[in-house]
């Protein structure tokens, strides 16, 4: 079957409890906490509801081009949008994809829902049409204990209704909670009940009462300004341009979850495949590579050659394999002109050298189905197609 290898990978993935909502949000949460539409409820019948998808829990450093490339591998897209904060320009971690063919939308859900990208497990579901009952259901919570986890925050608020998403703001340098969070309910009336029940109350472990109010209240403009300062503060962990900093954060996250990558594999991975420290070339030293003839290096990133793919393999399989290691620019499976079947190899272009090298170290020799993959940086030698 065409999707056997892909389904095998999805079935071995473990959901991210820390990034996900409570278990009753089966229709898909939204990872944004301001002005974010909720996922569509089951049973919608409009034509748009069959082609329009909402994608949650995207890596914050994923670009519009990477977003389009991922979902474009499924079928023809009419439109797609990665939603960004209007003040900071930062991705809010969710987006929308509208396919031309409803079958492609359904295929995208079946294929990409649960896909592990970097440190995130994305959620793909039908987008729910907006209505008065679901608007303005997002709450701003301050005064939270610094030790409170996202799961504990959800447990505190879940008694008032179905939680779509939750978030606790943390210091970008120390990782310590700022005592501020967001909760988005399925309906506004649930949010109103939570305000009545929790505003001014002391949750377990708190020394002061918490403040609970609607996040989109005009008085919350100051909190948006604070968020803007978080991203623009000169006290950043890494000096230099912001896009370089983002790539270093990607590497930090990658190293932190390196051993967790093994859960995606169908077979054991030796410890040497996921070393605790792996940085042959840092992003800060990339400028020294200009003009050098380095295997795999292209104008858009680092090209990886993947050999011994099965005839039924397609681009989605490559996304599944390489997505957990870092930012993937594009993937390509080389197909036979007559049969349209995979000729046994393909290419993956990744933005960052460290992440590409980690992917090669982990996936070279990996058994996918009944085949052992050969993975390496692409050399200048052209592969016949």
From Swiss-Prot:
Methylated by CARM1, which leads to reduced RNA-binding activity and enhanced interaction with SMN. Methylation at Arg-248 by CARM1 weakens protective binding to the 3'UTR of CDKN1A mRNA and down-regulates CDKN1A protein expression, thereby maintaining cells in a proliferative state. Methylation is inhibited by NGF, which facilitates neurite outgrowth. Coiled coil: none annotated. The modification Omega-N-methylarginine is found at residue 248. Residues 18-33 have a biased composition (Low complexity). One of its GO terms (cellular component) is axon. Residues 12-48 are annotated as: Disordered. GO terms for biological process: 3'-UTR-mediated mRNA stabilization; cerebral cortex neuron differentiation; dendrite morphogenesis; learning; locomotory behavior; mRNA processing; positive regulation of 3'-UTR-mediated mRNA stabilization; RNA processing. Residues 51-129, 137-217, 302-380 form the RRM domain. This is ELAV-like protein 4. It comes from Homo sapiens. The lineage of its organism: Eukaryota, Metazoa, Chordata, Craniata, Vertebrata.
């Amino acid at each position: 079957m065409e999707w056997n290898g892909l389904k095998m990978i999805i079935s071995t993935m473990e959901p991210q409890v820390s990034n996900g909502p409570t278990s009753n949000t089966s229709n898909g949460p939204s990872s944004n906490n301001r002005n974010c539409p909720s996922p569509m409820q089951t049973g919608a019948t409009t034509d748009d509801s069959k082609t329009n998808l909402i994608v949650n829990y995207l890596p914050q450093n994923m670009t519009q081009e990477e977003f389009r490339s991922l979902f474009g591998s499924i079928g023809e897209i009419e439109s797609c949008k990665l939603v960004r904060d209007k003040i900071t320009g930062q991705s809010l971690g969710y987006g929308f994809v509208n396919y031309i063919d409803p079958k492609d939308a359904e295929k995208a859900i079946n294929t990409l829902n649960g896909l592990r990208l970097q440190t995130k497990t994305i959620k793909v579901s039908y987008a729910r049409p907006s209505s008065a009952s679901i608007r303005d259901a997002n709450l701003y919570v301050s005064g939270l204990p610094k030790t409170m986890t996202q799961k504990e925050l959800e447990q505190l608020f879940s008694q008032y209704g179905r939680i779509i998403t939750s978030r606790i703001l943390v210091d970008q340098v120390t990782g310590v909670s700022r005592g501020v969070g967001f909760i988005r309910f399925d309906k506004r009336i649930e949010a109103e009940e939570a305000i009545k029940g929790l505003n001014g109350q002391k949750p377990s472990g708190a020394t002061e009462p918490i403040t609970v109010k609607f996040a989109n209240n005009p008085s919350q403009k100051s909190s948006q300004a604070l968020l803007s300062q978080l991203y623009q503060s000169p006290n950043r962990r890494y000096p230099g341009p912001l896009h370089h900093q983002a790539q270093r954060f990607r590497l930090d996250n990658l190293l932190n979850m390196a051993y967790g990558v093994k859960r995606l594999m169908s077979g054991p991975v030796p410890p040497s495949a996921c070393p605790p420290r792996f940085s042959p070339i840092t992003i800060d030293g990339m400028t020294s590579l200009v003009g050098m003839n380095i295997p795999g290096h292209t104008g858009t990133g680092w090209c990886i050659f993947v050999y011994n793919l099965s005839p039924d393999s397609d681009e989605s399989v490559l996304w599944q394999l390489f997505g957990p290691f870092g930012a993937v620019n594009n993937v390509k499976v080389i197909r036979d002109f007559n049969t349209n079947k995979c000729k046994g190899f393909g290419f993956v272009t990744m933005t960052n050298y460290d992440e590409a090298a980690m992917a090669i170290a982990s996936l070279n020799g990996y058994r996918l189905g009944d085949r052992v993959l050969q993975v390496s940086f692409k050399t200048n030698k052209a592969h016949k197609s």
